[in-house]
UniProtKB/Swiss-Prot annotation:
It catalyses: S-methyl-L-methionine + L-homocysteine = 2 L-methionine + H(+). Its cofactor is Zn(2+). This is Homocysteine S-methyltransferase 1. Residues 6-320 form the Hcy-binding domain. GO terms for cellular component: cytoplasm. Keywords: Amino-acid biosynthesis, Cytoplasm, Metal-binding, Methionine biosynthesis, Methyltransferase, S-adenosyl-L-methionine, Transferase, Zinc. GO terms for molecular function: S-adenosylmethionine-homocysteine S-methyltransferase activity; S-methylmethionine-homocysteine S-methyltransferase activity; zinc ion binding. The keyword Amino-acid biosynthesis applies. Present with 606 molecules/cell in log phase SD medium. Homocysteine S-methyltransferase involved in the conversion of S-adenosylmethionine (AdoMet) to methionine to control the methionine/AdoMet ratio. Also converts S-methylmethionine (SMM) to methionine. The keyword rRNA-binding does not apply. Zn(2+) binds at residues 238, 305-306.
Length: 324
C-alpha cells in the first residue's frame, strides 16, 4: 500500500510513531564493508562495480536494509550523510555537478526500489562538520558566522528537493548554532519539501558548541511566521543513549508544540582520537524504558544512530507498539 504524505501523517495522525532504521555506517562496517574514507558510508556507491547486479557490496547494503525493515523500520535513510558535493568531488572521481546529480539520483533510486513504495525515505544530509570531522565539538573556527552554509548544502539539497522518491529531508547531527540559524533562515524556495533538523547534543544537554536548548528554542520561537512551513520536526541524533530521554524531555519542554524525533547511539562511547568504541561503565537503560520516555515527550520518529543494529530497531519497534 502506498504511503500517505509524511506531513499529513505527522500533522493529522498524532498517535502515529514511525520507526527509523539504525546506524547504517557502523552496521555496514560490522558486515565487512570498508568505510574508512573521507566520504564514509557513501564510499561503496562511488565504485562503478557497486552498480553491477552481482556486486557483493550491493548485496550487503540490500541485506542491511532488509534486516532493518524486518525489524520494523518503516522510514529509512539514504546512505548520503557524508555525500556532500565538496567531499565527493575532492575524494572521488565524481568532479562535476552533473556527475554528482547522477550519483545521488542512482543512490535514491536504488534505495526507493529496494524499500518499496509503502515505506518513507529520508534524504540524509550531514552537517558542515562532517566535511572537517568536528561533529563532536561543533568547533567551526573563529568565524562560523562567515561560513557559506547554503553554498555547501545547495547541490545535495536541490537534488533531494526535486527527487520525488524523497519524502523527508534530514539535516543530521547539527552541532553549531550558526549553522542551525542558517538552515532555519531558509524559506520554502530553498527547502521546498518537509524537513527536520537533528541536533548533536552533549551529555550536559548543550549543542556541541555550548549553545543551550533554551537559546535554540528562543530563536525558533522568535522566527514566528517567518519560519519555513516545511519544518516538520526537530530532534536530536548521535547523542548518548543514557542521556537521550532527558535531552528529548528538555527539548519537548522548550518546544511543546513541535513534533520531535530522536535516534541515539547504542550506548557505546566513541573515542574520536583513537576512532574506537567502548562500553560505558555505568548501566544502560533498556530500549523499552527509554522508548516509553521518548513517546511521552513528543517523539514521532524513533530510531538508532551509531552502532545500533537491526536487533535494536526490533526492540524499539516492540516498545513503540506497546506505548504509542
Amino acid at each position: 500500500m502506498k504511503r500517505i504524505p509524511i506531513k499529513e501523517l505527522i500533522v493529522e495522525h498524532p498517535g502515529k510513531v514511525l520507526i527509523l532504521d539504525g546506524g547504517q555506517g557502523t552496521e555496514l562496517e560490522n558486515r565487512g564493508i570498508n568505510i574508512n574514507s573521507p566520504v564514509w558510508s557513501a564510499a561503496p556507491f562511488t565504485s562503478e562495480s557497486f552498480w553491477e547486479p552481482s556486486s557483493q557490496e550491493r548485496k550487503v547494503v540490500e541485506e542491511m536494509y532488509r534486516d532493518f525493515m524486518i525489524a520494523g523500520a518503516n522510514i529509512l535513510m539514504t546512505i548520503t550523510y557524508q555525500a556532500n558535493f565538496q567531499s565527493i568531488s575532492e575524494n572521488t572521481s565524481i568532479k562535476t555537478l552533473a556527475a554528482y546529480k547522477r550519483f545521488l539520483d542512482k543512490i535514491v533510486s536504488f534505495t526507493r526500489e529496494f524499500i518499496g513504495e509503502e515505506r518513507y525515505l529520508i534524504g540524509s544530509i550531514g552537517p558542515w562538520a562532517a566535511h572537517v570531522s568536528c561533529e563532536y565539538t561543533g568547533d567551526y573556527g573563529p568565524h562560523p558566522e562567515n561560513i557559506d552554509y547554503y553554498g555547501f548544502f545547495k547541490p545535495q539539497l536541490e537534488n533531494f528537493n526535486q527527487n520525488r522518491d524523497i519524502d523527508l529531508i534530514g539535516f543530521e547531527t547539527i552541532p553549531n548554532f550558526h549553522e542551525l540559524k542558517a538552515i532555519l533562515s531558509w524559506d520554502e524556495d530553498i527547502i521546498s519539501k518537509p524537513f527536520y533538523i537533528g541536533l548533536s547534543v552533549d551529555d550536559n544537554s548543550l549543542l556541541r558548541d555550548g549553545t543551550t536548548l533554551e537559546e535554540i528554542s528562543v530563536h525558533i520561537k522568535g522566527l514566528g511566521n517567518k519560519i519555513n512551513k516545511n519544518l516538520l520536526l526537530m530532534g536530536v541524533n548521535c547523542v548518548s543513549f543514557n542521556q537521550s530521554a532527558l535531552i528529548l524531555k528538555m527539548l519537548h519542554e522548550h518546544l511543546p508544540g513541535m513534533p520531535l524525533l530522536v535516534y541515539p547511539n547504542s550506548g557505546e562511547i566513541y573515542n574520536p582520537k583513537e576512532k574506537t568504541w567502548h562500553r560505558p561503565t555505568n548501566k544502560l537503560d533498556d530500549w523499552e524504558t527509554t522508548v516509553k520516555k521518548f513517546v511521552d515527550n513528543g517523539a514521532r520518529i524513533i530510531g538508532g544512530c551509531c552502532r545500533t543494529s537491526p536487533k535494536d530497531i526490533a526492540e524499539i519497534a516492540s516498545a513503540v507498539d506497546k506505548y504509542s
